[in-house]
Regions:
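Intrinsically disordered, low-complexity regulatory segments
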Residues: 1-806
Length: 806
């Protein structure tokens, strides 16, 4: 249950729906855990009805403050004004806003006002009496008696709930579903941030670690699909601190499998030559666009029934969403195979598999492992493996012949890794792990070489940038120095700089270390040049040392479980387009399953001829009380027409009047409705329909992962009945109540088949095939194996049951 002390500490909305409801909770947005393990929530101080802004001093500058001192805003401004007026260049103090964190016990003693209490420019509370909390009770109280005020209206809820626009207009149960379902959103091929957000999107994207964030400011030196190199600029560093020179290399993740089998891919959003600052987003992650969270797509929605296809939360979508890859996602499956050391001898990863045609091996390399880029479907071999099989005892003569002629094929069987049913895609990656001390195969060596090559390329780039930065610095040091004699190239003997001239950066780049140290300049300048050269060389030495360690790590074998010689992982990527049966949802708990994908020309269309992209049932709104989706739809329509993105923060969002004014500004109907025309007949519908843009997500409950069919497959050892579940390639359970249904229908033979030949009548199920092929009437069913199991169980109780024939 929700307790008053949860306020600002534990989110009352985000919790699972099942048996764990209320047992698993999330921290609220601003909550933190103190040194004793208790949750604290931040508040701003209120004195005599005025909100006092406090700041913590981060840099003292030339003020009288001490570091980390807590001061009022007016004191800080006064001190900084004083420094600015003083003669010379005084450094003002730098500070960050400070809040007072209170635990639940501390909070009981104070009167705390709500964040949306009206204040003037000075921070004074406008109303005589304000709504506040005291000892867990909500009261109205004089403004002078207020001690603290909330930091923000979204202090109450967690991060997931704070991403729902118009949360205040949604019922709590649906908000709970909305915050939980955002976690199930599938990363799409083409991301798009929401037209109507809450302002938290960029914060969440940055803090999630999905994006690549700039560590140190500088200029982008190189960008490609795999890495971003930022040349750290000297302006950001203290002068002469060579250790800070050089480059930051950001390696981007490409097509990595997540735990949900979705694809983690990062793509750069900066250009070469662009100046970047610390904390700036350099590359988008799997669910972000331009550094903002982007879990779904904005689609044009109409709230209306359409020929029964959106009955009971079903969703009707336009073919345009499939054609233009709106909801196409990439999924990556991992398949693993181990070669073990068995009692009969070691298993072997090989291309040489008995009784397999050459066409089935066409995509395997000489090591027996599939090549990257191969297209695979059900039953294709991914990794060839043979395992020794226990032979019947050989006579000594046969053993001798085997030893002489190397007749091997007879004593191994095929145990290859094959593509399971329902998988069709492209091999994107292969990983090979070999035991220490075991000779690596050609493929493993090739993978290792590629990795070392990539590492070397990164190091060469870093060394290049360090040397360029060093040369730039040396040029600055020598900018005021004239050469005391001619500078001659040691090798060729040509004069590079004449006496009395200055040396430029280009010439410095041509000079060797020895020549740089011998430049005819003043002693001070030469000493500075020597220091810079030594610092850069030390930096390069450290880089090369790290690379050498990494190389040794790569060349060493891997730690594998006992008995495993080699382990191979193959990653297959699949493109999944939107299909009937996929689950979709908005951010307000408005979830549904796609019932039909309709041609664009048949969808209802607006008066200007624009067909809608998705049709939702209006009956899904009133009883569920998630009206936020309707307000989002209205504001989204205005946003798309105006070419803007709106942020409506939780509990502080856009009001109805503000939505009206935005719709007016966009020259759209103020009521958010429009006459629609039937795409099939061209006739207008009777009434106006609510139309607009809504943000919809595709959830990771995809029909392709769930659909399953079985004809003949594995059986349980004891009962001889088919196994259950998709993972075991099992059948569907035909339970007690399903039997009643068939009995009620009088479908006697169907029922008999289900209970015998389709289940555990071992003899009958092998004979039925024969009779179907020959077109004969099948024999009477035999005895189900489960009856034999029952007899055995009774025998274990010392009850002998015999089957007597008449």
């Amino acid at each position: 249950d929700v307790h008053p002390t949860h306020y600002g500490r534990i989110c009352p909305i985000e919790t699972p729906e099942g048996p764990n409801i209320g047992l698993i909770s999330s921290l609220a947005c601003y909550a933190r855990i103190n040194e004793y393990g208790f949750i604290e929530s931040p508040y701003k101080k209120v004195e005599d009805g005025r909100v006092v802004g406090h700041y913590r001093i981060v840099k003292v500058g030339d003020t009288d403050f001490s570091l980390n001192e807590i001061v009022e805003k007016k004191e800080l401004e006064k001190a900084n004004r004083k420094v600015a007026k003083a003669k010379g260049k005084g450094q003002p103090a730098e500070a960050e806003p400070y809040s007072f964190y209170l635990s639940a016990w501390d909070e009981e003693k104070y009167v705390i006002a709500q964040a949306n209490a009206v204040t003037d420019d000075e921070g004074n509370l406008v109303h005589e009496r304000v709504i506040a909390r005291q000892a867990g009770e909500t009261i109205q109280i004089e403004r002078e008696k207020v001690d603290f005020i909330d930091v923000s209206p979204k202090q109450l809820v967690s991060v997931a709930a704070s991403l729902i626009p118009f949360l205040e207009n949604d019922d709590a149960n649906r908000a709970l579903m909305g915050s939980n379902m955002q976690r199930q959103g599938v990363p799409l091929l083409r991301t798009e941030s929401p037209l109507v957000g809450t302002g938290m999107e960029s914060t969440v994207a940055r803090d999630s670690g999905a994006t690549v964030v700039c560590k140190r400011g500088g200029v982008v030196d190189l960008v490609d699909s795999n890495r971003i190199i930022v040349r750290v600029e000297a302006e950001d560093l203290q002068t002469g601190q060579m250790k800070e020179f050089g480059a930051d290399i950001y390696q981007l993740t490409k097509f990595r499998r997540s735990n949900q089998n979705t694809s983690i891919t990062q793509k750069p959003i900066v250009r070469e030559g662009q100046r970047v600052t610390k904390g700036q987003v350099l590359a988008d992650g799997p669910c972000t666009e331009a550094g903002e969270l982007a879990l779904g797509r904005n689609v044009l929605v109409a709230f209306m029934p359409w020929r029964g296809y959106n009955f009971e939360d079903a969703i009707l979508v336009s073919e345009k969403l499939v054609k233009e890859d709106y909801y196409t996602s990439i999924h990556i499956e991992e398949f693993e195979i181990e070669a073990r050391d068995t009692k009969l001898g070691p298993e072997e990863i090989t291309r040489d598999i008995p009784n397999v045609s050459e066409s089935a091996l066409r995509d395997l390399d000489e090591s027996g492992i599939i090549r990257i880029g191969a297209t695979v479907k059900q039953g294709d071999i991914l990794v060839g493996k043979v395992t020794p099989k226990g032979e019947t005892q050989l006579t000594p003569e046969e053993k001798l012949l085997r030893a002489i002629f190397g007749e091997k094929a007879g004593d191994v069987r095929d145990a290859s890794l094959k593509t399971p049913p329902g998988i069709e895609g492209t091999v994107v990656d292969v990983k090979i792990f070999s035991r220490k001390g075991v000779e690596k195969d050609l493929r493993a060596k090739a993978i290792e070489e590629t990795e070392i090559e990539r590492m070397n390329r990164n190091i060469q780039d870093e060394i290049r940038i360090i040397n360029e930065a060093r040369n730039k610095k040396i040029a600055e040091v020598l900018s005021g120095e004239k050469m005391q004699r001619d500078v001659v190239d040691f090798k060729s003997g040509e004069t590079l700089v004449k006496k009395g001239e200055k040396v430029d950066r280009e010439t410095i780049g041509k000079l060797s270390r020895r020549e740089l140290l011998a430049l005819p300049v003043s002693e001070d300048a030469r000493e500075e040049v020597r220091t810079l050269i030594e610092q850069s060389e030390n930096r390069i030495k450290v880089l090369e040392q790290k690379a050498e360690e990494r190389r040794e790590d790569l060349e060493k074998g891997d730690e594998l479980p006992p008995g495993v010689i080699k382990m191979i992982k193959v990653y297959v990527a699949m493109k999944r387009k939107l299909s009937v049966g996929d689950k979709m949802a908005g951010r307000h708990g408005n979830k549904g399953v796609i019932s039909r994908i309709l041609p664009e020309e048949d969808m209802p269309y607006l008066p200007d001829g624009t067909p809608v992209e998705i049709v939702l049932n209006p009956l899904g709104v009133p009883s569920r009380m998630n009206v936020g989706q309707i307000l989002e739809t209205h504001l989204g329509w205005a946003a798309r027409s105006l070419g803007l993105h709106f942020a409506t923060p939780v509990f502080d969002g856009a009001l109805e009047d503000e939505i009206h004014s935005q719709l007016e500004a966009a020259n759209l109907p103020v009521n958010g409705k429009s006459i629609l025309y039937d795409g099939m007949t061209g006739e207008p519908f009777e009434q106006q329909v609510t139309v607009g843009y809504i943000y919809m997500l595709k959830l990771s409950h995809l029909v392709d992962d769930k659909i399953h069919a079985r004809s003949i497959g594995p059986y349980s050892l004891i009962t001889q009945q088919p196994l259950g579940g998709k993972a075991q390639f099992g059948g569907q359970r035909f339970g007690e109540m399903e039997v009643w249904a068939l009995e009620a229908y009088g479908a006697a033979y169907t029922l008999q088949e289900l209970l015998t030949v389709k289940s555990d009548d071992v003899e009958g199920r092998s004979k039925i095939y024969e009779s179907i092929v020959k077109g004969e009437v099948p024999d009477d069913p035999g005895l189900p194996e489960s009856f034999n199991v029952l007899v055995r169980e009774l025998q274990s109780l010392c009850l002998d049951v015999e089957l007597l024939k008449e």
